[in-house]
Amino acid sequence: MGRNKGIEQKVWPLAERVGGELNLEVVDVEFVKEAGRYFLRIYIDKDEGVDLDDCQNFSERIGVILDEEDPIPQSYYLEVSSPGIERPLKKLADFEKFAGREAQIKTFAAIEGQKQFKGKLLGVRDGQVVIDAGKGEVQIPLEQIAKANLTFDF
């Protein structure tokens, strides 16, 4: 399963435009190839959570724009959904918004001898993400974060 960052970067501002019109936050945009087929996945959210109508309205509007702008040369399937309970964290604002929640962060390079941190998000300080991973606070620059998401233990 490979991702195509170039297409994602072209689609992101189009998705944010639609999100702004519908009062929805664009959480993530993924363009992937799975089992020989391409999928454009757009994850949306709002404070009270999204429902099927939100996803349908967003899908209809973004579909028209994607047809007009045509940023994707090959055929693909469009999927619009909620990010789920283990939503990805992409922007500094995400880490601030979900301070106090449990999260998992993977970094590109080792920080304090490790590349994976799981613990309580403490927010943002001096432009860096702060997490308490059980051994005290760790500050992680956003550009060093390879992947981050909320975690939920059942």
Swiss-Prot record:
It comes from the Bacteria. GO terms for cellular component: cytosol. SUPFAM superfamilies: YhbC-like, C-terminal domain, YhbC-like, N-terminal domain. Belongs to the RimP family. Its main location: cytoplasm. Pfam families: DUF150_C (PF17384), RimP_N (PF02576). This is Ribosome maturation factor RimP. HAMAP family: RimP. Keywords: Cytoplasm, Ribosome biogenesis. It comes from Carboxydothermus hydrogenoformans (strain ATCC BAA-161 / DSM 6008 / Z-2901). The keyword Cytoplasm applies. It is found in: Cytoplasm. Required for maturation of 30S ribosomal subunits. InterPro entries: Ribosome_maturation_RimP, RimP_C, RimP_C_sf, RimP_N, RimP_N_sf. GO terms for biological process: ribosomal small subunit assembly; translation.
